[in-house]
Amino acid sequence: MRNRTLADLDRVVALGGGHGLGRVLSSLSSLGSRLTGIVTTTDNGGSTGRIRRSEGGIAWGDMRNCLNQLITEPSVASAMFEYRFGGNGELSGHNLGNLMLKALDHLSVRPLEAINLIRNLLKVDAQLIPMSELPVDLMAIDDQGHEIYGEVNIDQLATPPQEIMLTPNVPATREAVQAINDADLILIGPGSFYTSLMPCLLLDELAQALRRTPAPMVYIGNLGRELSLPAASLTLVDKLAMMEQYIGKKVIDTVVVGPRVDVSAVNDRLVIQEVLEASDIPYRHDRQLLHNALEKALQALG
């Protein structure tokens, strides 16, 4: 079908984590419940890492970030959810949203139930699904063959790892697999390459679903240089090759990137190269500009 718009689609699925996924979801929030985010759950730093070390469970920080960016009706509940403790006490640095999600996780049968309770409280229409409902961490093999455990340590590597994997081996959330199966459009990125994007692709069931889906797939590149040293050295072609290596098939049809990205070696896919930067924070995507670029990509794909 020609001239489809995002509003015509029944199911749009975005994968990733951190600020990047939240930005994509907020730029497409007009889709309401037709929009689904599959969220990385391997963070082990900051408030999230402290909660995991103390209480166990999945990482809630990326999920909280997505929920924060999807709030459209400010309320007492949203102010509480976004509150971060200051000072020097035991709660210093903790985000109340992380603690609320963890508390509801304790009160629920499944983490997904906790997320849906918070979504209803915050009046968030988009569906949000953790990539797995079991605790899992990212692990890498560095260029010396050493095992490097956890996102925080992997981001501090001087060179790209030889291999990345999840530990332990956990199943994907079944609703995440079903969302990919039902998708009309799939988006990957932006976000920290190794620690926000790759974890979802390392789950066997999600990789298999991405191999099988007929839905067009779009990779959204970062704006500016990554803070993670190993990821900062990767080119656009490197990233596309690595994602598809772990997925197991050439599946990415389109890349959406800013004007400073070298796309000269990307000759086998559609490239949408536009100004995407937000005026207030240059390395963040402007919601409307990103929305427009995705519309252009969808129409070019036909």
Swiss-Prot record:
A cellular-component GO term for this protein: cytoplasm
Parts forming coiled coils: none
Keyword flag Cytoplasm: yes
Gene Ontology terms, MF aspect: LPPG:FO 2-phospho-L-lactate transferase activity
GO biological process terms held by the UniProt record: regulation of cell shape
Protein's UniProt keywords contain Translocase: no
Chief localization: cytoplasm
Top-rank taxon: Bacteria
Protein location: Cytoplasm
Keywords: Cytoplasm
NCBIfam families in the cross-refs: CofD_related (TIGR01826)
Function recorded in the entry: Required for morphogenesis under gluconeogenic growth conditions.
Annotated family: Belongs to the gluconeogenesis factor family.
Name this polypeptide is given: Putative gluconeogenesis factor
Species of provenance: Salmonella typhi
Gene name per UniProt: ybhK
